[in-house]
Swiss-Prot record:
SUPFAM superfamilies: Glyoxalase/Bleomycin resistance protein/Dihydroxybiphenyl dioxygenase. Its main location: mitochondrion. The lineage of its organism: Eukaryota, Metazoa, Chordata, Craniata, Vertebrata. Keywords: Mitochondrion, Phosphoprotein, Repeat. It comes from the Eukaryota. Interacts with NUDT9. InterPro entries: GLOD4, GLOD4_C, Glyas_Bleomycin-R_OHBP_Dase, VOC. The keyword Phosphoprotein applies. This is Glyoxalase domain-containing protein 4. Residues 5-130, 137-258 form the VOC domain. The keyword Manganese does not apply. The modification Phosphoserine is found at S131. It is found in: Mitochondrion. It comes from Mus musculus.
Length: 298
């Protein structure tokens, strides 16, 4: 499965300005592209909402060889209830630790050389105070699971991920498609996984010809297919094919055809300006305030 790639994790954003400040100024990521949409996504990329929304990709380098964050902002939604499903992203960056201290962004030491911080909305990030040993500082995404063995069967046997580490006592496992890619860490928890409204989505690419086979495999194994194979359009950019799956705990997983995605995900030198212009033009808070209405909760 060396042809598969870990691409990004999707976050729902309630305050775009503060969130961009965190990713850009605290973590030190750059805006790779920014896209505005007038209506909801056919694959529910922005969540189960059908109004105006935007997508901003941020990362430490081009999407071809970096795991990045997708920030989805729904103009009419002001809050998303957090669940226990997303347990954090770990990255190696002494610069991010230094930035957080300089900007007085809250940091708490959780182990020697490791600090916990939160993005707006409560999403946890773990910063290792060291230089990255690979070109991409993003090391792993940690998701909660209710039954580690069942999850390992799904992610490894069905989705073809290699198991890099497994600790029965600590109920955790580390998986990935390649040594130099961001890994997926599965952490067993007591009780059920609660996705609430802030739930995200992890995305991978594979050769486009594998998408129908992947969908057929999930049908045969009686696993969830949230969105059967569909084409997604982005104004002025490449059309991609995706299938959206869910693992045994309901974590959303997007598989996208790699060839078209490499076209779509090319870095846009105007991305940062497009985002800044969109934030400046966003009067949704004022619109709701003048009508004495709160934005809806997700």
């Amino acid at each position: 499965m060396a042809t598969r790639r870990a691409l990004h994790f999707v976050f729902k954003v309630k305050n775009r300005f503060q969130t961009v400040h965190f990713f850009r100024d605290v973590l030190g990521m750059q805006v790779l592209r920014h896209e505005e949409f007038e209506e909801g996504c056919k694959a529910a990329c922005n969540g189960p909402y059908d109004g105006k929304w935007s997508k901003t990709m941020v990362g430490f380098g081009p999407e071809d060889d970096h795991f990045v964050a997708e920030l989805t902002y729904n103009y009419g939604i002001g809050d998303y209830k957090l669940g226990n499903d997303f347990m954090g992203i770990t990255l190696a960056s002494s610069q991010a630790v230094s930035n957080a201290r300089k900007l007085e962004w809250p940091l708490s030491k959780v182990a020697e050389g490791i600090f916990e911080t939160e993005a707006p909305g409560g999403y946890k990030f773990y910063l290792q105070d060291r230089s990255p040993s690979q070109s991409d500082p993003v090391l792993k995404v940690t998701l909660a699971v209710s039954d580690l063995q069942k999850s390992l069967n799904y992610w490894s046997n069905l989705l073809g991920m290699k198991i890099y580490e497994q600790d029965e006592e600590k109920q955790r496992a580390l998986l990935g498609y390649a040594d130099n890619q961001c890994k997926l860490e599965l952490q067993g928890i007591q009780g059920a996984v609660d996705h609430a409204a802030a739930f995200g989505r992890i995305a991978f690419s594979c050769p486009q010809k594998e998408l129908p086979d992947l969908e057929d495999l999930m049908k045969r194994e009686s696993h969830s297919i949230l969105t059967p194979l569909v084409s997604l359009d982005t104004p002025g950019k490449a059309t991609v094919q995706v299938v959206i799956l869910a693992d045994p705990d309901g974590h959303e997983i997007c598989f996208v055809g790699d060839e078209a995605f490499r076209e779509l995900s090319k870095m846009d030198p105007k991305g940062s300006k497009l985002l800044d212009d969109a934030m400046e033009a966003d009067k949704s808070d004022e619109w709701f305030a003048t009508r004495n209405k709160p934005k809806a909760s997700g």
